[in-house]
Amino acid sequence: MITSALHRAADWAKSVFSSAALGDPRRTARLVNVAAQLAKYSGKSITISSEGSEAMQEGAYRFIRNPNVSAEAIRKAGAMQTVKLAQEFPELLAIEDTTSLSYRHQVAEELGKLGSIQDKSRGWWVHSVLLLEATTFRTVGLLHQEWWMRPDDPADADEKESGKWLAAAATSRLRMGSMMSNVIAVCDREADIHAYLQDKLAHNERFVVRSKHPRKDVESGLYLYDHLKNQPELGGYQISIPQKGVVDKRGKRKNRPARKASLSLRSGRITLKQGNITLNAVLAEEINPPKGETPLKWLLLTSEPVESLAQALRVIDIYTHRWRIEEFHKAWKTGAGAERQRMEEPDNLERMVSILSFVAVRLLQLRESFTLPQALRAQGLLKEAEHVESQSAETVLTPDECQLLGYLDKGKRKRKEKAGSLQWAYMAIARLGGFMDSKRTGIASWGALWEGWEALQSKLDGFLAAKDLMAQGIKI
């Protein structure tokens, strides 16, 4: 199970990295130790995570500086653990996206271009494939990462960056083997490339890709949007759009109020002229948007069936979970501290930040272990949600963590929260992070959960030390 080793940093590190092929078992053991400390003190430096031990700190730095340690081997070890976990699930989503890692300190001059040549920030571009299980959309793990530095002169590039989509597909295929038939690749508009679509279809693989280019359907001769607009409406659905600050066409910032949007759904079978590719498409388009608002519109290309309303809604639901990889990027850069690292050599920095990519996945999974009931309810699995909520909090927390959390939450537990249950633990941690549930939704934000988790962990060492002293008969 995903949660079996998740909450104990040492167990988690062992499960993810103990199979790393680093050329010497002592290096692998050191990787496990370093990863465990970085996970225990997420977002903190090696110095802080070493807990005042000079030997631990020096050992960690020696590992990070070791030229015989391959960053790619570190990433592969984590990816193969993801493959192992994936065997539990009948269907998976492979969410793909690219992000940049930006640095301005001394090492920056040896890294690649991110913006203009004049920019002081330089770094890497990283394309990631993140696996989710397709029922409750829990994060399984990282399946693949490709890192590269963009040269100042595009003519110096080894190959087109668009090749990252085909490379990710090939690596996923190799690692997943026969399980690849259970995997649906989910990509944004950048993946709307003829070679990528053709490759997925040639290998009989599944995908949902948002359309970018004004392609035409061969049979109707119409552009895809116009062709789908001519198809009968399957039905509609509503979504809630949160409040957000936006920049208008004149560059002025304004507040976009929260609203509900009604969308219509149409679908059809299409054939693209280039390569004579035949696939399915779904068009979701907002009906009667407020004056001044750009209507929501998604045109999705897919291998999945789309004949019925339920099938089309499933494709939409799959694509809406693409945002999870954006949360991974946030967890990696901010929560795990990838962009706060200050190693002075590119290779050392890459080793460190590669470890932190899996620490970031753990942060996502920690949150999801508490929010699983909400995910189950969203899929209509009410009995399953109630069953999970009623489980003991010790299924995800240690007895000491439960005891400390109970002390910190004393007098705050609501009547509907069963003492010692997972539902209570979720709400108690959220309250510790400042969640007031003023809207009576019972659903805490990412930030509140993480703040609460950090607060619990920061107090745990003192709590354990006090217990130890009391066990020795020392009054405190």
Curated annotation (Swiss-Prot):
GO terms for biological process: DNA transposition. Changing residue 438 to A: Abolishes formation of the synaptic complex and transposition. Changing residue 319 to A: Loss of strand transfer activity. It comes from the Bacteria. InterPro entries: RNaseH-like_sf (IPR012337), TN5-like_N_sf (IPR038215), Tn5_transposase (IPR054836), Tn5p-like (IPR047768), Transposase_11 (IPR002559), Transposase_Tn5-like_C (IPR014737), Transposase_Tn5-like_N (IPR014735). Changing residue 372 to P: Enhances transposase activity. Belongs to the transposase 11 family. This is Transposase for transposon Tn5.
